[in-house]
A protein has these predicted regions:
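Transmembrane alpha-helical segments of polytopic membrane transport and secretion proteins
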Residues: 1-29, 90-94, 186, 266-303, ...
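Membrane-water interface segments at the C-terminal ends of transmembrane alpha-helices
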Residues: 19-50, 56-168, 196-223, 248-267, ...
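Conserved MFS/SLC helix-loop-helix module at the cytosolic interface between two early adjacent transmembrane helices
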Residues: 89, 93-94, 173-176, 180
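Membrane-helix/interface signature in polytopic inner-membrane proteins
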Residues: 164-175, 185, 419-430
Length: 529
C-alpha cells in the first residue's frame, strides 16, 4: 500500500474522508456549544467590567481555592504512591474488585460522600466517639481540613489508578532482570520505579489540582465560614445572600482564568508513559517477597480500602435507619432528579455522536466538546442567569438549565470514548462498508451503532450518574418548588434533620448506581458483533 504525502496509508485517509455520514449534525452541535459556553462567558465578562475590582474578600477566596487544591493534590498523590506500589506488587483474591471499586468515588454523588465522611469523621462520628472513649479531644471536620479530607477521599482513588497504570507499563522482564542481578528494593526503586514516577506524578498532581479548583459542593457543605470560602462558593453567596450580580461576575472571571490556566497546564504536562517494550507478562516482584514488605503492603492496601469503604458503609447503615424519616419532598425531588438526569444523558449522547462523526473528518471539531473541561459549571450558570434574568424568572428555567449544563460537563468524557471507538470502527470496517454502498442512516444503523453500543451504554451510565448527584447550577437557580435530590439533602442537613438526610443520601446513592448499572449493562448485553 503506497503512503500518501502526509505519511498515512491512502486507503485509511480515504475511509476517513468517506464515512458518508452528514456533516450538518456536527456543525449544529458545535455552534450550539459555542453559543452555550461563549454566550455566558461574554455576559459574565461584560458584567464584571461594571462590577469594579476584586475586594479583599475575593482575593482571600482565591488564595483559599488555590491552597486547598494544592494541599489536596499533594496529599492525594503522596498517599497514592505507596498504595499503587502495593497493588502493583501483590496478587490476592479480590484484587480486581478492589481496583474496580477505586473508580466508585468518581460517580459517587458529592453530597452522599459528605454524609459518609460526617458519619465517620464528624462531631458524632465513629472517630470522635473513639477519641472521646480514649479521653482525647474531638476533631473538627469543618474548615480547610474538612475540604481537603473530602478531596482526598475523591481523588486518592483517581491518583492511585493513574500511578498504578504507570507501574503496569514497566515491562515484567525488567523486574526479572533486576531479580537476577540481586537488586534490593531500594535499588529497584531508584533504577526502575523512580524514572516512571518522575514522569507520571506531575500529570496526576495537576489533574487532581484542576479538579479540586471547581469543587463547589464540598466547600458548600464543609467550608466552615468566610475563612474557608472558595471562589465558587463566593459566587453562590454573592447570588443568594447579597444578590450582587456585579461581584458574582467578577468572581466568575477570576474562577474562569484560574480553571483555564490549570486545565491548560494539566493538558500540557502529558508525558509519554512508555518505558520500553516487553512480552506483556504478569509482573512478579522477587525483591519484595520478604515478610516485612508483604506485611507493609497488606497494611497499606487495608488502610486504603477502609478509608474509601467505611464512609460508604456508614451511608448505608445510617441511611437504612433514616428511610422512614424522609419527608414527602424527598420523593418528589428524586423524581425531579431522575428526569433531569435522563434529559442530560440524551443531550450529552446526542451532542457526542454528532461531534464524533464530524471529528472523523475534521479532528479540530473535538475541541468543541472539550471546552467543558476548562469552564466551571457555576461560571456558565452565572452567565446564563445574567442573560435570562431581565426577561424571565431564572427559577422557571432551573431544571432545564441544570440538565443542559450537566450534559456539557459530561460531554468531554463521552465524546472522547465514542470518538476513539468510532475511529477504530471506520479503520477496521469502513473500507468494506463504503465498497458496499453503505451510507447515511444505513451505515449508522448496521455498521456503527451495534459496535458503539457498549461505549454508548457506559457513557450514558456515567452521564446519568454524574447528573443525578450534581449540586452546582441547581443551587443558583432553584426555588422551593424545583429541588433536585442533592439540593433537598442539603436543605435537610441545613435544618439539622440528619436522619432524614441520611435516608435521602442512601436513596440518591442507590439511584445513581442503578442508573449507571442499567445503562452500562444495557450497552454490554447482546452487543457482540
Amino acid at each position: 500500500m503506497q503512503p500518501s504525502p502526509n505519511g498515512k496509508p491512502r486507503w485509511r485517509a480515504s475511509v476517513t474522508r468517506r464515512t458518508s455520514l452528514p456533516d450538518w449534525p456536527g456543525l449544529l452541535a458545535g455552534l450550539f456549544l459555542c453559543a452555550l459556553i461563549l454566550g455566558p462567558l461574554a455576559a459574565v465578562t461584560l458584567r464584571a467590567g461594571g462590577g469594579g475590582w476584586p475586594v479583599a474578600a475575593d482575593w482571600a477566596a482565591l488564595r483559599f481555592t488555590v491552597l486547598q487544591a494544592v494541599l489536596s493534590a499533594v496529599i492525594s498523590v503522596a498517599l497514592a504512591v505507596p498504595v499503587a506500589r502495593a497493588l502493583a506488587r501483590r496478587r490476592f483474591p479480590g484484587r480486581g474488585v478492589l481496583i474496580t471499586l477505586l473508580g466508585a468515588p468518581f460517580i459517587l454523588p458529592v453530597i452522599v460522600a459528605v454524609l459518609g465522611l460526617l458519619a465517620v469523621f464528624g462531631r458524632g462520628g465513629v472517630l470522635n466517639d473513639a477519641l472521646l472513649w480514649l479521653g482525647l479531644p474531638r476533631v473538627q471536620i469543618y474548615g480547610l481540613h474538612g475540604v481537603v479530607l473530602a478531596h482526598v477521599f475523591f481523588n486518592l482513588p483517581l491518583a492511585t489508578r493513574m500511578i498504578l497504570q504507570g507501574w503496569q507499563a514497566i515491562p515484567a522482564e525488567r523486574f526479572r532482570l533486576a531479580a537476577s542481578l540481586g537488586m534490593s528494593p531500594g535499588t529497584v526503586l531508584r533504577i526502575l520505579e523512580w524514572p516512571m514516577l518522575r514522569t507520571v506524578l506531575p500529570g496526576a498532581a495537576l489533574i487532581v489540582f484542576a479538579l479540586c479548583l471547581s469543587s463547589f459542593a464540598v466547600a458548600l457543605t464543609l467550608g466552615g465560614g468566610p475563612r474557608a470560602t472558595t471562589l465558587e462558593l463566593a459566587i453562590y453567596q454573592a447570588f443568594h445572600f447579597d444578590f450582587d450580580l456585579g461581584r458574582a461576575a467578577v468572581l466568575a472571571v477570576m474562577q474562569l482564568v484560574l480553571v483555564i490556566a490549570a486545565a491548560a497546564l494539566a493538558l500540557r504536562v502529558n508525558p509519554a508513559t512508555g518505558f520500553g517494550a516487553g512480552l506483556d507478562r504478569i509482573q512478579r516482584r522477587w525483591e519484595a517477597e520478604t515478610p516485612l514488605l508483604r506485611t507493609q503492603d497488606a497494611v497499606l492496601i487495608l488502610l486504603a480500602a477502609l478509608f474509601l469503604l467505611t464512609p460508604l458503609a456508614a451511608v448505608v447503615w445510617h441511611g437504612a435507619a433514616g428511610l422512614m424519616e424522609m419527608p414527602a419532598q424527598v420523593w418528589n425531588a428524586a423524581a425531579v432528579s431522575l428526569a433531569v438526569s435522563l434529559v442530560a444523558t440524551v443531550l450529552c449522547l446526542s451532542l457526542a455522536m454528532a461531534l464524533a462523526t464530524l471529528a472523523l473528518r475534521r479532528p479540530w471539531v473535538e475541541g468543541f466538546g472539550l471546552m467543558g473541561i476548562a469552564i466551571s459549571p457555576l461560571v456558565i450558570g452565572t452567565g446564563l442567569f445574567l442573560i435570562v434574568n431581565p426577561w424571565v424568572d431564572p427559577a422557571r428555567l432551573a431544571l432545564g438549565v441544570t440538565a443542559l449544563v450537566n450534559a456539557v460537563m459530561a460531554l468531554p468524557f463521552a465524546l472522547r470514548m465514542i470518538l476513539l471507538r468510532l475511529r477504530e470502527i471506520e479503520e477496521t470496517h469502513g473500507r468494506l462498508a463504503t465498497s458496499l454502498g453503505m451510507t447515511g442512516g444505513v451505515r449508522l444503523r448496521w455498521l456503527i451503532l451495534p459496535r458503539l453500543r457498549p461505549v454508548l451504554g457506559f457513557s450514558a451510565g456515567l452521564t446519568a450518574a454524574l447528573s443525578m448527584g450534581d449540586l452546582g447550577v441547581i443551587a443558583l437557580f432553584a426555588d422551593m418548588e424545583n429541588a433536585t435530590l442533592p439540593l433537598q439533602i442539603l436543605r435537610l442537613m441545613g435544618a439539622y434533620r440528619m436522619d432524614a438526610a441520611a435516608g435521602a443520601g442512601l436513596l440518591l446513592l442507590a439511584l445513581s448506581l442503578a442508573l449507571f448499572w442499567v445503562f452500562d449493562k444495557g450497552g454490554r448485553d447482546n452487543a457482540s458483533v
